Amino acid sequence: NLNGHHYASWYEKFLSIHRNSATNICEIGVQDGSSLKAWYDYFSNANIIGLDVKNKSCYNNDRISNYILDQSSSKELDLFVKRCNRDNLTFDLIVDDGSHDVEHQQVTFGKLFRLLKPNGIYIIEDMCTSYFKEGENLYGYIQTKEKLKYNTVSFLNNRPWVSPWISDEDLLYINNKVSYVSLFDKPFLYVHGNSYKCINDYPPRSITSIIQKK
């Protein structure tokens, strides 16, 4: 949620350079359409694609298109990537504000990171779910030992990256193509370049990552 978690002021630091040049934006998790509207207003020259498990076509307009996609399904993500490749569609910005489940965050990152343009930005919102306790319900998804072991905050804080939900081929691509990772835990910002500071000691408060491609 772009406005609800006050992300906008933080994103400006990273996205302003793309504001006039961006042509394609993708957001996973549409909810009430407010974030799509924010991207529509901010990136005046960009087409925006929304992906959600529910039909959100009511938010379509001249530059916004919505499609049904379940990010828990590798098959559906693969089909989306295949369609983008067929249409030569790449993105300046991809935002994952979907299920917030750590497995889904990593599966989606592994599949969609290739769709970023050089210097493109990939954002994963609400990684505070990495700290939910075993057995706790995460927006309808149950936290498990495996998810706690490979939570998304720890995943992004370590190199080379290892994930049971991302193929070796995609992990190699990610490790070779990431320029930097920035993690912020409202209201503090942690920018680390190629060195990462673990933030595991901080309480879970809408932790978000900003990942730039080379």
Give each language-model segment a name.
Residues 1-95, 99-124, 128-214:
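A short alpha-helical cap/connector motif
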